[in-house]
Amino acid sequence: MRTEQINGHPLSDVVGGGDPELVAQEVVTAIEKYGELCPADSILDVGCGCGRIAAALTQYVDRESHYVGIDIVPGLIDFARNFITPRYPSFKFLLLNESNKTYDWWLRQDGEKGIATLAEGVSPKSIDLAISVSLFTHLDYAPALEMLTSIHHLLKNDGRVFMTVFVLDAAAINAIEDRRAVFSFKQRTPTGKLNAEKSDDPTFAVAYDGGVLDDLIGSAGFQLERHVRGYWSSGGPGETFQDALILRKAKNPDLGEHRAKRSEKYFSAGDYRRPERHAVQ
């Protein structure tokens, strides 16, 4: 399925700008490479927007594969329902009734479901792969944990997550200090746990110190399998703009065990800095 109808749509800027087809293909290629995308997967797309990733996924998954996309912006869900579902009936889209300062301009608060009632639209332990692109970059810690915990509830045993975030590790901090990064993340979110790009709009873009990110992942019952660095901080070409994380549903979702196994496999010692010590000048 091509996405010409998304180009030039009044809501196209809400989903991040850029060429929808190229951006979606970039993301889906990374999902296939790192997220073990299989044609028969049942997929949950959290923050699906107008369906640009869904449109790209139609070329990768079986026509009978089960896909559910969720978002908080009514116009985007309406567009996806009208544009994709008639062609691919197994692709469904749900509207969540949640608030986010960055998107409040586009919201109506009589939505269909909230995060806590998401299971009404998706059966527990029914999802093989959850995708969340450019969602956790707009959430403070508490709603991020609530959402990731809800995703955990819906995944099958050994289910996996492909999610994008901004990670403030040593390499990213060096890029910020050298003015090679797109963002500086000098502010803090209201909880004080995350770094923010804008003080007057904290959820415009948030970044995770590695210790906080590790706590989030472990508290939600996941283990980190891989971190793919995004080109927002690399100063050069990359596979995705934001950092991509591959998570696996932990067999024993114990935070202490998760921390003990935390990941020299993916990050060198000292990469992470705790929030109280982190300050980008």
Region roles according to the model:
Residues 42, 159-160:
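Short glycine-centered segments of the SAM/dcSAM-binding site in methyltransferase folds
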Residues 1-34, 50-57, 66, 70-121, ...:
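Class I (Rossmann-like) S-adenosyl-L-methionine-dependent methyltransferase catalytic domain
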Residues 40-49:
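Conserved class I S-adenosyl-L-methionine
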